Regions:
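Terminal, low-structured helical/coil segments at or just beyond the last alpha-helical repeat
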Residues: 92-128
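Canonical positions in the second alpha-helix
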Residues: 30, 63-64, 97-98
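Alpha-helical segment of the N-proximal tetratricopeptide repeat
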Residues: 3-33
Length: 128
């Protein structure tokens, strides 16, 4: 209905103005009315990424991917999070999935593969 999408629209406007606290409340309200609001979960993940809250970011990214396993932006963000956490196996699996489904974020494919390769070479050095 119109009411829920108003929460999402206003949340995006506030997010773009970097008013993360107020936009977070609106995205959460949108989810109350529309538990399948892929965009609200994605924006919440971006807010938690901005706040360095890896736990909440991962929960919201997983919600996006549960609703739409092809969401390349969520996959991209989750690969970066797993690289940050040095979770090699999970990052590799997600990276393979990202390469298969990337649409709007295909330009990020090379960048993310380089980060992944750097992580694996750094791990190899630290294990010697």
């Amino acid at each position: 209905t119109a009411k829920e999408s108003d929460y999402l629209k206003k949340g995006i406007e506030l997010f773009q103005k970097k008013d993360f606290e107020k936009s977070k409340i609106l995205f959460e309200r949108d989810i109350v009315f529309d538990p399948k609001s892929e965009k609200s979960y994605l924006y919440l993940a971006k807010i938690f990424n901005n706040n360095d809250n890896d736990f909440e970011q991962e929960i919201n990214l997983n919600n996006v991917l549960l609703l739409n396993p092809q969401n390349d932006e969520a996959l991209y963000m989750l690969v970066l999070l797993k690289i940050k956490q040095s979770d090699y196996n999970h990052a590799k699996k997600l990276l393979d999935q990202f390469v298969l489904v990337c649409k709007s974020f295909c330009s990020k494919k090379k960048e993310i593969q380089e980060k992944f390769e750097k992580m694996t070479s750094d791990d190899a050095k630290s294990n010697n």
